A protein has these predicted regions:
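Membrane-interfacial amphipathic/re-entrant helices at transmembrane-helix boundaries
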Residues: 1-26, 273-274, 278
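Transmembrane helix-bundle core of multi-pass membrane transporters
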Residues: 2-16, 87, 94-154
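Loop-to-transmembrane alpha-helix initiation sites
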Residues: 17-20, 65-73, 92-96, 139, ...
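Short loop segments and helix-boundary regions at transmembrane helix junctions
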Residues: 33-115, 211-223, 240-243, 267
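Small-residue-rich segments of transmembrane alpha-helices in multi-pass membrane proteins
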Residues: 50-60, 97-109, 129-130, 173-183, ...
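Helix-loop-helix "hairpin" substructures at the membrane interface of multi-pass membrane proteins
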Residues: 135-207
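Transmembrane alpha-helical segments in multi-pass inner-membrane proteins
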Residues: 198-249
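Cytosolic-side transmembrane-helix boundaries in multi-pass membrane proteins
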Residues: 245-284
Length: 284
């Protein structure tokens, strides 16, 4: 049994893949709780797609992919915010238009300028081809985001629940808003190499959704989201070794399965609470 567990660790590429999956899981999990609370799940989706033209342009210009992806992600967020403030359309409609437009522009650029960048690696990542340098860069981003959230999570929480009260309390709403957007963009850049554009959406939504189904206190949700993300990410890479499948989709399948379990468990728990609350008054 122990040999079955340790077999994947005999290969350096598997060790690197598990390491990068854990490193990526931490900032994604922390941010996912805020995204779910604010109703910004589609924002993570939009920014994940929007970085595509940034990656292609970065290749054309000859700059690091991370810079192009970060700028494109911020451009998507700023454009969405501007249109949201200056039009009568709902935010989800605006985000759908912006991210589909930017993703389409990325595809046009990708076809127009032949490059050595593989589309599959951009969309789905290349976790098994991760280098130690990639792990180092991703770890730096993860530490920065974890440190910011660790120091300012109460401010971000108040801004997420009640921006008006946050402003009245002396907090700078604009700084918190765009700071959160910057962290989302940075996290997407970190996930780009490992899980790709498409599958980063799951990492930015599922851990927070699962945690908020199971616990009530915010700090507990943060901790549980991180634990869930690390477990599913590392477990998905390990399981992919035996299933002979790609790690990133396997991770997403684990997240989905765990979400179903969490949903069923929370539904049963809530129904039992309702029955208990109905029995107690009658008994009194």
């Amino acid at each position: 049994m122990l040999n079955l567990f340790l077999a994947p660790f005999q290969f350096p590429f598997m060790v690197n893949a598990i390491a990068i999956s854990i490193v990526v899981a931490i900032p994604c999990a922390l941010l996912s709780v805020f995204l779910v609370l604010k109703g910004w799940a589609l924002m993570g989706d939009a920014m994940s797609h929007a970085v595509f033209p940034g990656v292609v342009l970065a290749y054309i210009i000859g700059i690091p992919f991370a810079i192009g992806a970060f700028i494109a992600g911020l451009l998507c967020a700023v454009t969405t915010g501007f249109l949201d403030d200056n039009s009568r359309l709902k935010r989800d409609t605006i985000m759908g238009i912006v991210f589909s437009g930017m993703f389409g522009a990325g595809l046009v650029l990708y076809v127009a300028f032949q490059s050595d960048v593989h589309l599959d690696h951009i969309l789905f990542g290349d976790m098994l081809g991760i280098s130690l340098r990639d792990i180092g860069q991703t770890t730096a981003i993860a530490l920065v985001i974890a440190l910011i959230i660790g120091l300012k999570w109460r401010d971000f929480l108040l801004h997420a629940f009640d921006p008006t009260q946050a402003k009245a309390s002396g907090l700078r709403g604009g700084l918190l808003h765009y700071g959160l957007l910057c962290m989302i963009a940075l996290t997407i850049v970190a996930t780009l190499q490992s899980v790709g554009i498409i599958l980063s959406i799951s990492l930015l939504i599922a851990p927070g959704a699962i945690a908020l189904l199971l616990v009530r206190r915010f700090i507990h949700a943060l901790l549980l989201a991180v634990a869930v993300a690390i477990g599913c990410s590392a477990g998905g890479v390990w399981l992919a070794f035996y299933l002979d499948s790609a790690p990133a989709p396997t991770i997403v399948v684990l997240f989905t399965a765990l979400f179903v379990v969490a949903f069923v468990a929370s539904t049963i728990r809530d129904s039992q609470k309702q029955k208990t609350s109905a029995i107690i008054p009658g008994g009194g």
